[in-house]
A protein has these predicted regions:
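Active-site-adjacent substrate-binding region
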Residues: 1-78
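His/Asp/Glu-rich mid-to-C-terminal helical/loop segments that flank catalytic regions of hydrolases
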Residues: 69-100
Length: 100
């Protein structure tokens, strides 16, 4: 499972940033469920791309974080993921559904 704490470009336009307490809760759920996870960032600063709807949900006051399977070369002719990452992502979503 890969967590992305913040997204956006051009300053704060169309961006979101998970607060420390929400990040801590997400990490705690993963630790309690013995799920392996990592954090990442979404591409280069101010380059755009990497679309997400998290910022829209954040506009309504929701705590948001982007999460998913780590992918190498997304949108390329051959995207690559690890079977272990896919398995841990499934376990992470289950842990979150049961404990959050």
């Amino acid at each position: 499972m890969c967590f992305n704490k913040f997204t956006g470009s051009r300053g704060k336009s169309g961006s979101n940033d998970a607060n420390a307490e929400f990040m801590a809760r997400c990490r705690a759920v993963m630790v309690e469920g013995q799920v392996k996870f990592q954090t990442a960032e979404l591409g280069k600063v101010n380059q755009g791309g990497g679309g997400t709807i998290a910022y829209i949900c954040a506009l309504y006051g929701m705590n948001v974080i982007d999460s998913g399977v780590a992918v190498l070369s997304m949108h390329a002719p051959w995207e690559i993921i690890s079977k272990a990452d896919l398995y841990e992502s499934a376990r992470a979503y289950k842990a979150f559904a049961l404990n959050a």
